[in-house]
Each structure stands twice: as C-alpha cells, then as structure tokens.
C-alpha cells in the first residue's frame, strides 16, 4: 500500500456535504485531491465520465464518486474502458472492492449512508491493495469481457 495517492473526487448536487467531508478527510491524511464535481447543469454521468477518464489516463491513481446512491456513478464510470468502479455499501465491500476486484474507483451514496459510515468505508478501501492470487485471473476475465464488448465496433447497445 502506498502512503498517499492522487485522488479525484466527484459528486453531483445531491452529495456535496459527503464529498466535502471526504475531501477534508483525504487531505488531512496527505492525499493529493482534485475535485472534479458537477458544474452548473451537469449530471452525475458527466462527472463520472470525467473522473473515470482521468483515472484511465493515469492522471489520478484512485477516485471517489458520490451521488444519491452511488449506483449511477458506478454504472457510468464503468463505461470507461479500463475502469473498475464499485458501489460501496459497507466496509467489507470496500475492502473486497480493492483486494478482490482491483477497483480504482469507490462510489458512495449520500442518501444511503451517513458521512461517518462513509468515511469508515473510505478508509477500508484506501488501505486495501489488490491481493492478486485467485482473484487475478478473474480480473483478467473482466478485462476480456470489456475488450469484447465495450470496444467492439458494431455491437448493438443493450
């Protein structure tokens, strides 16, 4: 585990308070935080895409997205090739998102959990690293699924 990361933060209008608490928490721990939250008129898919593209390009090592449930952000971020974003409902899922799935982006719901619980989950996610082992072939299969479906021309949308 690294001591500090370059972390992008993104939130929609429903999640400003949680995002601000997370930003303060991350900065206090020495992480370099870039806030890429919604500008006027932007919706969560716009934010998720901007943040996920930055992670995919290597501008950020990890990212945190927050909307009402975390679900929409995760869905949108996962449309960017190379990204594994996980909706985080609890600390065990936060840990497993990193250790088993190598998720670079954690997605939280401001309407589904309190700020303190979210910060506990955020810490579990931050201190966990991809374990490899038996999970490595599964993550490789996820990449193969992505390669076959997200980048194949002529594949009709579902």
Question: Residues of each region from the PLM?
Answer:
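Helix-adjacent hinge/juxtasegments
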Residues: 47, 51-88
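C-terminal binding/interaction regions
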Residues: 2-15, 91-158
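A short beta-strand-loop structural module common to alpha/beta enzyme folds
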Residues: 32-42
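Structural motif
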Residues: 10, 36, 66-67, 88, ...
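Short, structured coil segments at secondary-structure junctions
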Residues: 29, 81-83, 101
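Short amphipathic alpha-helical segments
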Residues: 20-23, 75-79, 119
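Glycine-rich phosphate/diphosphate-binding loop of Rossmann-like nucleotide-binding domains
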Residues: 8-29, 33
